[in-house]
């Protein structure tokens, strides 16, 4: 637990996004913006710059992606159940076939995003920009 606290504090000091769990797949995502079918359960990508990232097939259960730049990101077939995407920029993101049960999209920008065949039971969209969404 102390390792995670120190990592979080260092990254807050330097003003960058940080990952609390600190495993190899999360580091890979931050470095390459590609982590197909990765297990990112409980990952912490708050305020991360992940434009056009490929999360296809990834497990992002309970992940924190609040205020992240995810424009054009690919979440095809990903599990984002109980994930937090509040305030995230998801313009043009692809959620086709994704599981989004109880996902929080509050205050996010979802303009021109695609949700074809997405499972969205209980998802929250309070004050969310949904202009041009495809489903």
Describe the residue ranges of each PLM region.
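Positively charged n-region of N-terminal signal peptides that target proteins for export
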Residues: 1-5
């Amino acid at each position: 637990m102390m390792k995670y606290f120190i990592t979080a504090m260092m990254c807050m000091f330097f003003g960058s996004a940080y990952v609390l769990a600190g495993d190899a797949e999360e580091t890979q995502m931050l470095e390459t913006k590609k982590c197909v079918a990765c297990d990112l359960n409980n990952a912490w990508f708050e305020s991360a710059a992940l434009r056009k990232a490929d999360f296809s097939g990834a497990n992002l259960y309970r992940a924190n992606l609040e205020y992240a730049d995810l424009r054009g990101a690919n979440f095809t077939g990903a599990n984002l159940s109980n994930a937090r995407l509040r305030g995230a920029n998801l313009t043009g993101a692809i959620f086709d076939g994704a599981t989004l049960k109880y996902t929080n999209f509050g205050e996010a920008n979802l303009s021109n995003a695609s949700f074809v065949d997405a499972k969205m039971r209980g998802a929250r969209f309070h004050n969310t920009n949904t202009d041009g969404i495809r489903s």
